[in-house]
Amino acid sequence: MQNRQVANATKVAVAGASGYAGGEILRLLLGHPAYADGRLRIGALTAATSAGSTLGEHHPHLTPLAHRVVEPTEAAVLGGHDAVFLALPHGHSAVLAQQLSPETLIIDCGADFRLTDAAVWERFYGSSHAGSWPYGLPELPGARDQLRGTRRIAVPGCYPTAALLALFPALAADLIEPAVTVVAVSGTSGAGRAATTDLLGAEVIGSARAYNIAGVHRHTPEIAQGLRAVTDRDVSVSFTPVLIPASRGILATCTARTRSPLSQLRAAYEKAYHAEPFIYLMPEGQLPRTGAVIGSNAAHIAVAVDEDAQTFVAIAAIDNLVKGTAGAAVQSMNLALGWPETDGLSVVGVAP
């Protein structure tokens, strides 16, 4: 609970506040120490189709903000804030960002500014490329230096977050072949809150379903881009997403050919992650599970080698709404504002 107001507090707006990602951002902000001591103030809450409703109609768990009225998502409403989170479908953030001050910290949870290659963007999204911003996955090499003090942040996609954290240490150390396979299962909240037939309870409960396979999914080029950034070799990615009957969580199983021993691979992961507050490299013989990370900003990672098949296996579990979206957004905000990176974020899940 916020106890007092502080002069020159950082005023934060959330666009797309009625959606799952927007609601999760607000949940984390309500638990942020800067909110508790008044250094952070939650300003405008906006949405496109639910303007005029109260936030409590969409997120009854956010009781401190339940009475707040959702406003239209317009630059006139979002202007005047120190930081703006954009939790919007792709194609919407770029237009809004152009209308906001260069001094405003804009944290885009959509896809508009993630890809650096205009041709790749146009191929997968079918619209003009708006450019690229610093990538909000601090654990990647060099990412923190780009995020500190920036005023524009592109939050990674949820699947790429899991895949990149699972794979980059091995690839950066040149211990696996640069042709990787990623099979990732996800809860339905990753598809957003729109009412579609495929997400009805009767369609989801008791059923698992692959979708957008064979290089079609829009997160495929984002995974490849992130992996290419840590090696001087070209990287190919085969990505298969699978929807499972759960509300949250991603479990990514990533494989690649290797001739390196497990001891050498584990050493690469220990070197990459030993000082990372949100990464838990599991002991040998233990495997990640989504239930252990739900509600947290943690990523649980395990590595193994199938010696008969000469195949490296890395498994990562994250909460798609926290480390996969809102947690990465808040973590990146902390870095951009010069606050402790871990503020407002937990490594403790809520399992079972």
Swiss-Prot record:
Its main location: cytoplasm. The lineage of its organism: Bacteria, Bacillati, Actinomycetota, Actinomycetes, Mycobacteriales. Its EC number is 1.2.1.38. It catalyses: N-acetyl-L-glutamate 5-semialdehyde + phosphate + NADP(+) = N-acetyl-L-glutamyl 5-phosphate + NADPH + H(+). One of its GO terms (molecular function) is NADP+ binding. It comes from Mycobacterium tuberculosis (strain ATCC 25618 / H37Rv). Transmembrane segments: none annotated. One of its GO terms (cellular component) is cytoplasm. GO terms for biological process: L-arginine biosynthetic process. Keywords: Amino-acid biosynthesis, Arginine biosynthesis, Cytoplasm, NADP, Oxidoreductase. Pfam families: Semialdhyde_dh, Semialdhyde_dhC_1. Gene3D superfamilies: Dihydrodipicolinate Reductase, domain 2 (3.30.360.10), NAD(P)-binding Rossmann-like Domain (3.40.50.720). Was identified as a high-confidence drug target. PANTHER family: N-ACETYL-GAMMA-GLUTAMYL-PHOSPHATE REDUCTASE, CHLOROPLASTIC-RELATED (PTHR32338:SF10), N-ACETYL-GAMMA-GLUTAMYL-PHOSPHATE REDUCTASE, CHLOROPLASTIC-RELATED-RELATED (PTHR32338). Pathway: Amino-acid biosynthesis; L-arginine biosynthesis; N(2)-acetyl-L-ornithine from L-glutamate: step 3/4. Belongs to the NAGSA dehydrogenase family. Type 1 subfamily. This is N-acetyl-gamma-glutamyl-phosphate reductase. The active site is at 158.
